[in-house]
């Protein structure tokens, strides 16, 4: 209760007010009829968006009020709103490392853990921003200018750099919200997004904290203890066979789920084409990228993330049950 009233509620109110000022709707009105610049009629959804978006980000939930998530101009209207939402995703997971050091009265340990997490995050940001700002070489070959970088699947009001930053921010946590299409990012960018979720330790999320990172600490302490010939200890407790068995199972379970799921999907795609066709065909991009789409889907589900390579037609019986 205290975490809700002292942390989540105040932060949600602050972020909500900022989003309202930036243009996010807040009310209980139904669809609004508007006339577009082309002269056609369109119905635009409204509702309590500014109340839902803050807790979606602060709680590392990621489920958007609108179907296209934070790509929608009413959910993420401006560049400043985009920055605030990025901050909202990271603030509590980042604070977990400091809270760990504070409550155990070992602040240096908390700082070192935070430093490792931050380093991994910044490496991912640098790679993705440089990849997306550099543009698509295939489009360069056509002689088409890419002054704003690789803009496929991205919002003009945000640009390629902000979308690349968000893609790393949402995958180093268990958030999963998006402000652009991850399936349209450059190959190395997509790899970094997948790698973040496969490691599944950077920052974590609200509810589980950095539980997976703690597992790797236990394994590292045990191995280092064996290397120097002393009994491994962490936080004053011996790390013995029982702890190692639990940590090993937890560490191996994540890749096991991902690989088994991907292998099953790939097998069905090749050996049961009639079943795949009955579900709409699954892949819009067969080949290497199609395999990446299936791998990303199971990686995202196993990491409790929720983002996806949306070239995959995953709203089917098979994908809903296997991912669930």
Stretch-by-stretch model annotation:
Residues 1-324:
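Membrane-proximal intracellular helices of multi-pass ion channels
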